[in-house]
């Protein structure tokens, strides 16, 4: 947090425009992520709240939520306020038997979801129906006004998120009244071999590989920090 003397600065303005972030070189100094690992509400005021803190606010509608933050020492991520669980996507729109992304076969050690997503977008952006596959859907995901940096997480990143799955699921059900996670598996952007890719079955606490042509859901994320 930036301080003026001993006072925390909570709003930074450039003229009449509110500044969302300040960097010193490549280091983000405003705003800071929460110091404690866990699940947070990212509010429209661009602050992170624990769920108990959020419940004390005057307006606790989902419309006040820009996303849910997973803060972990191995990686922190912003998740959408609500995931479209009714849509099914193939892993890629074509070339189901082709190597597409790097780090093939490393499985849970892959933490390069953003890179994987960009490679697939570059490969398929001119293919008819290119938004009908998991990484294409995630790349074009713009549900809230916080930028266009969404991507399909790698299997390693999904497993970090999965550590907080029960807490996030319970909190969202209690406060907002809907189930955040689906009974369907989530595709990762990690390829296992020429014909299969990794997915996370959050409902059954398992991860495995599946044929790229199979239909599963997708969880877009933004990397934080």
For the regions a language model picked out, list residue spans one by one.
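Intrinsically disordered, compositionally biased repeat/linker segments
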Residues: 1-32
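C-terminal, surface-exposed recognition/capping segments
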Residues: 147-149, 155-225
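Short, compositionally biased
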Residues: 23-146, 212, 218-225
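Short, solvent-exposed secondary-structure boundary motifs
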Residues: 1-5, 54-60, 170-183
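A generic structural signal for short, solvent-exposed coil/turn residues
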Residues: 4, 14, 71-72, 179, ...
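Short hydrophobic/aromatic-rich beta-strand motifs
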Residues: 12, 69, 185-189
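Generic structural motif
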Residues: 7, 17, 27, 85, ...
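A broad, structure-centric signal for solvent-exposed, well-ordered loop/edge residues
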Residues: 11, 21, 31, 87, ...
